[in-house]
Regions:
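N-terminal secretory signal peptides that target proteins for export/translocation
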Residues: 1-9
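Ala/Thr-enriched low-complexity intrinsically disordered regions
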Residues: 6, 15-16
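Bacterial N-terminal signal peptides
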Residues: 16-24
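Short, low-complexity N-terminal intrinsically disordered segments enriched in polar/charged residues
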Residues: 28-59, 68-76
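Short solvent-exposed beta->alpha transition segments
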Residues: 63-136
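Exposed beta-sheet edge and beta->alpha loop/turn motif
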Residues: 104-177
Length: 177
């Protein structure tokens, strides 16, 4: 009979422990996206500058940091149309900042969730002609805003050479799941 009681006592301890794991631990980890991804120092500096511009609503800086156009693409523009492209790009940046601010509120901060860097050489003509040669970094950041507290920001950054500066080639915002 003593062995039966010990078995029952052990089972109740095990059941209590499993109940603790199943019921109490999931709420403790809910909402965690995992640790921040690491990015190269120059990429982190770019992100800080980019998101500081969002925080201060510095449209001119955001315009300067946005929309990559390769030298090959620039050379294909007819005379005078490159300035039209820049004006159109700058208007789009302004509209996007206004739209995101209206929908999400003021920017509060960010963290990098995922980052992937790929180098595309000029010799890889298909890729280089499609998205440009250089160092491409794709990021997903979790941004915090005043209205809808979290949004995921997808950024595709490019820099033409190791020593050049990053620029935003493409981006999108969406409410975090």
């Amino acid at each position: 009979m003593a062995k039966q009681q010990t078995g029952l006592i052990n089972r109740s301890y095990i059941a209590t422990f499993l109940l603790f794991l199943v019921v109490l631990l999931p709420p403790c980890t809910k909402g965690k996206e995992g640790p921040s991804a690491s990015v190269p120092t120059d990429c982190q500096q770019f992100l800080d500058k980019y998101f500081d511009a969002w925080k201060s609503k510095d449209i001119a800086t955001l315009q300067a940091l946005s929309f990559y156009l390769s030298p090959q693409d620039q050379s294909r523009f007819p005379a005078g149309s490159l300035e039209l492209w820049r004006a159109s790009k700058n208007n789009l940046v302004t509209e996007n900042v206004e739209h995101v601010t209206r929908d999400f509120g003021d920017f509060k901060g960010y963290e990098v969730l995922r980052a992937k860097t790929t180098t595309i050489s000029p010799q890889d003509q298909v890729a280089a002609n499609t998205i440009g040669s250089g160092i491409h970094t794709e990021l997903v950041c979790k941004a915090r805003f005043s209205k809808k507290h979290d949004a995921h920001v997808g950024l595709h950054l490019i820099k033409e050479t190791e020593g050049s500066q990053y620029i935003v080639a493409a981006w999108n915002f969406q409410a975090a799941p």
